[in-house]
Each structure stands twice: as structure tokens, then as C-alpha cells.
Amino acid sequence: MVMAGASSLDEIRQAQRADGPAGILAIGTANPENHVLQAEYPDYYFRITNSEHMTDLKEKFKRMCDKSTIRKRHMHLTEEFLKENPHMCAYMAPSLDTRQDIVVVEVPKLGKEAAVKAIKEWGQPKSKITHVVFCTTSGVDMPGADYQLTKLLGLRPSVKRLMMYQQGCFAGGTVLRIAKDLAENNRGARVLVVCSEITAVTFRGPSDTHLDSLVGQALFSDGAAALIVGSDPDTSVGEKPIFEMVSAAQTILPDSDGAIDGHLREVGLTFHLLKDVPGLISKNIVKSLDEAFKPLGISDWNSLFWIAHPGGPAILDQVEIKLGLKEEKMRATRHVLSEYGNMSSACVLFILDEMRRKSAKDGVATTGEGLEWGVLFGFGPGLTVETVVLHSVPL
């Protein structure tokens, strides 16, 4: 009896699991209509925050914006709104209620825009969605943005939800890792992944004693991205993976305590950055790559397609130097940084979308710039690094 029971349990467990790897079946992105040009932003920022008397600081901020390699950024906050809410423009004025009132509504709404596009590309009824993974660093509420999205989209009430708050910039990798595990361990699962970020929680005026906060004001922007993730695509209804996920890992870098911190206060979400973040990442990236690609026998990092969270150009520059990467390796990453800025968790998903679109446009052999294997890196508070090994598909 024991053997029969064990056998049937094994059979049940086997039947519950997918046969193949998790794949990204569709991608959708969305941004607020309002956008700012980086070249004009220092003048706008110091004017709207009533800080034009801080001329030296404004010059520093101009240099930060120039070095950012960003051309434009999308932002929900408009000049009209900020004029009506001057407490959000001061550096340390109590303003959390106003910020929360914005993000608890706008974060799921922007997420819905991206999700609708992903579901449309997927081409299947939304009733087939079994799981929702929602990620944001913009505000906290109960019930959460996952619940609000479920209602906005009209998903089944029995959909299984996971809400991730306050993870930061590495979380685009985290959601892929979680979606991979859900898809591969639940036969027939279709996971809707949404990352939605709005800088209304972090926007504030300048301070000449907190330059790390000013760095964030030069980089951060708003955007949402959504994916449908599932294993064993049903080709009879047109499902086809864009990328497959082979492995996923997370690690805390040594000697990196306090390198990136964020704290929710009465004044909103405050960020603190150390100057040596690019150095800490580049110093440890070889170890992450070795661990991820040793099973595949790959050690030529130029043979991979690259998707790296664009925390800023200095991080990308130092990673390129450390690994001897060719300039074109970070093309998709730098393009997204230039056209959208740092959208925190949503960035790497935007880069996936950019890469598959450019690959199709250029007529190369695969979704990964013509290459078979790729890597996706998320970097963020901790310092935490997410490493996802990707397999492209033929075009």
C-alpha cells in the first residue's frame, strides 16, 4: 500500500509540472503621455522646485543630466500638478499622503495599459491567465496593485496573485525568476507579469547636502511593462515563445551594505546611493556569469546577447570594460536608457521588447540579435543582483 501510494503521489506531482522550459509569450509596454526632454530638464526642475537661486547646484545637476546619456523621460507628474502641490517640490516637506493618493490609482492603471497590450499580442482569452505577479516600488496599499489590476482587467477572481512592493531596480529579474518557477511547476499555467513604476513617490526638490538624491532626479522615470509567461506553448492556438528562460539566480554582493538604500518617510521615498555602485557591480559580475553559464560551457561573454538594468551609464561602462564587451552588446540597453530613462523594475522588460523588435527589423536569425544564448541582469538595493539565462528563438 505504501509503494502504491508513493507511486501515485509521484504521478500526481509529475502531472502537475510542465514538460518544457518557461517562455515569454508576449510583451507589452506603456508610459504616461507627459514627457520631458533631458536637455531642458535642469531649467524646468529648478524652476518648478523654486530653487533657481541654487546656481552652483543647478550647474552640477546639468552635468549629471548631460552625463546620463538620457534623451527623454516620461513622467506622470505635470507642471500644473506640481504648481498646485508645492509641498512635493520641497526637499523634505511632509507629502506622503499626496504621493500615495497618486500612485495607488496610477500604478495599477499604467500597469493595465501594458497588460492589455501583452494580452492582445498573446492572442488568448484572459480567462486563461492563472497567476498574476505585480511589482512596484511606487507606493504601498491594501488590497494591493495586484488586486486593483485583477479588477481593472476583469480577470477571474480565482486568479492566484503575488504582490511585490519596494524591491527596487533588480526586481525586473525577480519577476522573471518567480514567473519561471510558477510556469514550470504548474502545468498549463499562464502568468501575467506586470512591473509598473511612477516617480511621484521619489520626486523632490534639490539639496546641496544630499547629492545622491539629485542623481536619482536626473535618472528616474515612469513606465510599465507586462509579460505573459508559460511553458509548453500551445502552437495550435498560435502561442510561440519570444525568449525561453533557462535558469535564474539571485545573490547579495559582498561588502555592499548600504550601497543602495530606499526609505519610506513622511516626505516620500528617499534614495541613497554610494559612488562605488558601478565598481561593486563590475567587480562581482564575472562570478555571476561563471555560475550561470558554466553548465552550458559558455565563457565568451561576447557570444551572448545582453540585457542589463541601465541603472546609469557608469554601471554599463564599467561592466563593458571589465568583461571586454563589444560596444554593440549594450545597444538595446543603452537605447532604452536614452529613450525612457531608468524606470526601475520595468527597464529590463522594455529592453527585451526592444531587442526582439530590432532583431525582427534587422532580419537576423533569432530574437536575441541573431545569437542563441543571452543574459539578463537586474541590479538594485542590497546590492542585490538577479541573473537570468535566456535562450532566443528563431525568427
From Swiss-Prot:
GO biological process assignments: auxin polar transport; flavonoid biosynthetic process; regulation of anthocyanin biosynthetic process; response to auxin; response to gravity; response to jasmonic acid; response to oxidative stress; response to UV-B
Chemical reaction(s) catalysed: (E)-4-coumaroyl-CoA + 3 malonyl-CoA + 3 H(+) = 2',4,4',6'-tetrahydroxychalcone + 3 CO2 + 4 CoA
Sequence positions bearing N-acetylvaline: V2
Active-site residues from the entry: C169
Keywords, in A-Z order: Acetylation, Acyltransferase, Flavonoid biosynthesis, Transferase
GO molecular function, one term: naringenin-chalcone synthase activity
Family: Belongs to the thiolase-like superfamily. Chalcone/stilbene synthases family.
Job of this protein: The primary product of this enzyme is 4,2',4',6'-tetrahydroxychalcone (also termed naringenin-chalcone or chalcone) which can under specific conditions spontaneously isomerize into naringenin.
Name of the protein in question: Chalcone synthase
